[in-house]
C-alpha cells in the first residue's frame, strides 16, 4: 500500500515543490490555457493549487453523499457551511494583492514607522525604484514589494501581506474546523457501521483485546464504509497540520510580528547571544536634537514609539567618538585603541530588553490584522 501511495504522490507532485509531477503539470497547463486572462484566480493557478483543490473536492465528493442520509438536520446545516468556507477564503487570499505601487507608495510610507531595529529608513528597492516602506519586502516571485509582508505562499501563488493576511488566517481557521469536524463526524459514522458489523457485546470488542485485534476490527469497519472511513482518516491526519499553522500565526499575532520579521528577530537573537548588541536612549545620544526622517506621519500616528537605540559591534562596547550609521545598526568606532568606552551604552543580554514597537498587545494586534480601529492612544 505504501509503495503505491508513493508512486501516486510522485506522479502527482514533486516532493520539493508539491506540484511538478507529470499529471499535475498536464492538468495545470490545461486549466490555465482554458481560463487564461478570464479571471485573476485562474490566470495565476498552479500545480500546488490543483493538488490542494483536487484533494479537497475529491474528499468532499466522497464523504458528503455517503454521509448526508445518515446525519441529523443539525449536521446538515453545518456541513455545507464548513465545506464552502475554505473555497471562499482561498479565493479571497489568491485574488487580493498587497503590492506597493508608485500610486499607493505615499500611503504605504505613512502606514508604519521605522523601528530602526529590523527596519531602517533610506533603503531603496532597486527593482521597484522607490524607498522601501517599513515592514515591506520585495518578493522575487511576485516581482513586487509587498506591504506588511508575511511570506510567499506556494499554495496561493501569492504573497500573504497586509491586504490578504486576514483572509489567509480565515482560510487556516476554516480548514482546521472543517478537518476536525470531518474527522469527528466520519469516525462517528464509522462507529455506527462497526456496531452493525460487530456489536459491542462481541468478544472482539472487549476491553481486554490487544492492539492487533483492535486495528483489525476498525480496518473491517473502514473497509465496509470506505468513502466515509477513508476521508475520515485523511482529515484526521491533516487536521493537526492545519491547526499547527493556525497556532503558529496566532503566536505571531501575539508577538506582534510577521513570518518575515520573525526571521529578522532571530538574527538579532543570535547577535544578542554573541554579545554584539548594545543599547542606549535617543535622549542620551541626541539630546534635544530632532531628525527630519523621524518626524513622519507614521511616527506621529502609530500608537507605540521607543526611545531606545540599538547598535551592533564586533563585541567591543562603543567608544567615545563613534559614529552611527543612518541606514543600519552598525557603528564606526573611533580609530584610536586608547579611546575610552562610552558609558552611555550597555550590553543587551536578553531579547526582552529590546522594544518591538509593532507589538500593540494581542487584541490590538488582531484588530490591526483585520483592519479594525486600534483602541490604544498614541504615546
Curated annotation (Swiss-Prot):
- Membrane topology according to the record: Multi-pass membrane protein
Give the UniProt subcellular location, in the record's own words.
Endoplasmic reticulum membrane
Topology check: give the Cytoplasmic ranges: 26-48, 98-166, 249-379
- Where the protein is mainly located, per its record? endoplasmic reticulum
Xref: PROSITE patterns: DHHC
From the record, give the transmembrane residue ranges: 5-25, 49-69, 77-97, 167-187, 228-248
Give the catalysed reaction(s), semicolon-separated.
Answer: L-cysteinyl-[protein] + hexadecanoyl-CoA = S-hexadecanoyl-L-cysteinyl-[protein] + CoA
Entry keyword Nucleotide-binding: no
What residue stretches are annotated with the DHHC domain?
A: 123-173
Q: Which GO terms describe its biological process?
A: protein targeting to membrane
GO molecular function list: protein-cysteine S-palmitoyltransferase activity
Which key words tag this protein in UniProt?
A: Acyltransferase, Endoplasmic reticulum, Lipoprotein, Membrane, Palmitate, Transferase, Transmembrane, Transmembrane helix
- Highest taxon above the source species: Eukaryota
Protein purpose: Palmitoyltransferase that targets several endosomal SNAREs. Palmitoylates the SNAREs at cysteine residues close to the cytoplasmic end of their transmembrane domain. May have a role in the cellular quality control of transmembrane domain-containing proteins.
This one is known as: Palmitoyltransferase swf1
Underlying gene = swf1
Amino acid at each position: 500500500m505504501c509503495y503505491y501511495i508513493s508512486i501516486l504522490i510522485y506522479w502527482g507532485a514533486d516532493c520539493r515543490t508539491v506540484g511538478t509531477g507529470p499529471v499535475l503539470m498536464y492538468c495545470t497547463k490545461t486549466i490555465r490555457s482554458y481560463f487564461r486572462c478570464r479571471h485573476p484566480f485562474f490566470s495565476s493557478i498552479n500545480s500546488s493549487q490543483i493538488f490542494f483543490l483536487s484533494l479537497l473536492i475529491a474528499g468532499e465528493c466522497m464523504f458528503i453523499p455517503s454521509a448526508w442520509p445518515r446525519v441529523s438536520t443539525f449536521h446538515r446545516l453545518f456541513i455545507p457551511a464548513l465545506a464552502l468556507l475554505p473555497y471562499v477564503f482561498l479565493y479571497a487570499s489568491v485574488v487580493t494583492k498587497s503590492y506597493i505601487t508608485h500610486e499607493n507608495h505615499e500611503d504605504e510610507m505613512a502606514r508604519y514607522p521605522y523601528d530602526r531595529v529590523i527596519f531602517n529608513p533610506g533603503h531603496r528597492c532597486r527593482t521597484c525604484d522607490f524607498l522601501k516602506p517599513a515592514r515591506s519586502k520585495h518578493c522575487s516571485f511576485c516581482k513586487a514589494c509587498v506591504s506588511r509582508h508575511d511570506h510567499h505562499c506556494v499554495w496561493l501563488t501569492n504573497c500573504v501581506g497586509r491586504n490578504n493576511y486576514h483572509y489567509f488566517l480565515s482560510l487556516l481557521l476554516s480548514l482546521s474546523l472543517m478537518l476536525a469536524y470531518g474527522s469527528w463526524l466520519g469516525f462517528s459514522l464509522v462507529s455506527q457501521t462497526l456496531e452493525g458489523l460487530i456489536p459491542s457485546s462481541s468478544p472482539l470488542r472487549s476491553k481486554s483485546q490487544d492492539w492487533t485485534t483492535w486495528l483489525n476490527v476498525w480496518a473491517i469497519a473502514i473497509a465496509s464504509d470506505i468513502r466515509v472511513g477513508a476521508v475520515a482518516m485523511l482529515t484526521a491526519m491533516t487536521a493537526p497540520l492545519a491547526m499547527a499553522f493556525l497556532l503558529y500565526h496566532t503566536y505571531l499575532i501575539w508577538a506582534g510580528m510577521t513570518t518575515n520579521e520573525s526571521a529578522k528577530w532571530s538574527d538579532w537573537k543570535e547577535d544578542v547571544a554573541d554579545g554584539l548588541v548594545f543599547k542606549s536612549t535617543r535622549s542620551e545620544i541626541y539630546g534635544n536634537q530632532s531628525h527630519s526622517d523621524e518626524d513622519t506621519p507614521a511616527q506621529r500616528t502609530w500608537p507605540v514609539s521607543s526611545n531606545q537605540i540599538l547598535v551592533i559591534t564586533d563585541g567591543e562596547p562603543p567608544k567615545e567618538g563613534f559614529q552611527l550609521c543612518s541606514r543600519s545598526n552598525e557603528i564606526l568606532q573611533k580609530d584610536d585603541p586608547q579611546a575610552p568606552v562610552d558609558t552611555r551604552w550597555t550590553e543587551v543580554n536578553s531579547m526582552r530588553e529590546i522594544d518591538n514597537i509593532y507589538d500593540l498587545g494581542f487584541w490590538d494586534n488582531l484588530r490591526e490584522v483585520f483592519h479594525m480601529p486600534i483602541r490604544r492612544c498614541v504615546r
